[in-house]
Amino acid sequence: MYDRKLPVKLGRGGIHNNILMQDAIERGITALQHHADTIHDYDVSKVIVIGTSALRGAANRDEFIEKVRELLGWEIKIIDGELEAALIFRGVRLSLPDRMGKYLIMDIGGGSTEFILANDDQIIWKRSFNIGIARALETIQMSDPVTSSEILAFEQWFDRHLGELWSICNQHLPRTLVGCSGAFDTFMDIYEKEESDLKIRKVSEFPLEAYREIHQRLILSDHQTRGKMIGMDKMRVEMIVIASVFTNFILRNLNIPKLLHTHNALKEGVMDLFISNGI
């Protein structure tokens, strides 16, 4: 399967005011035009375009949607947080073994972060929280490298939004955190010293001690140092530190002893739904 990600930062500068800035709209259009060229090269007959947090919350989203329609002929389907979480679960579940017990899926985005608590192939609870990394960085200014007081401020900000997560997990006590795609791909690439996008994975265990060592490297590093790390995805150099602060905070607060990584997430869930039922 062809897999390509392009950095857009659609919510930059306006996500807290629920607006798309003009430069962000232009970056989004440019990225979609690049994807359109690839789609043409592969003679693809069906295109599904999904909009998530930055679009669903933007007051001027129709401007972006109309430009995409005019330029490319594509209709963007904006999904709510509940459906996004359900599709993430559908994609992640394809990569997991049948017997998992209780586990928590975490998908860190720019505008939102999705958590899904499950037992084997059954969802117990799911929720999309508007606490993505782009929102965090527009709320709290981060030094380079990040300071201990800033880490505490980020953790307190996450904590204020996650009461429902703490409550449900204290009832069900998941023993595994499954980190999917995005930042977790980069954590694993750094661990395995693989250049980003050169390795196709299904699911793999991420030793906690190895993750903690990477976390320490990230929070002590400046932007230039991170950019030189083997395995670092260049589009994540800016946001990977806070993604790791968030991940470490979840592992520590919930006392979860096992970490898994999967590349599967939303797009695999969308494809599986399309293949199974149409969308």
Region annotations inferred by a language model:
Residues 2-6:
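Short amphipathic
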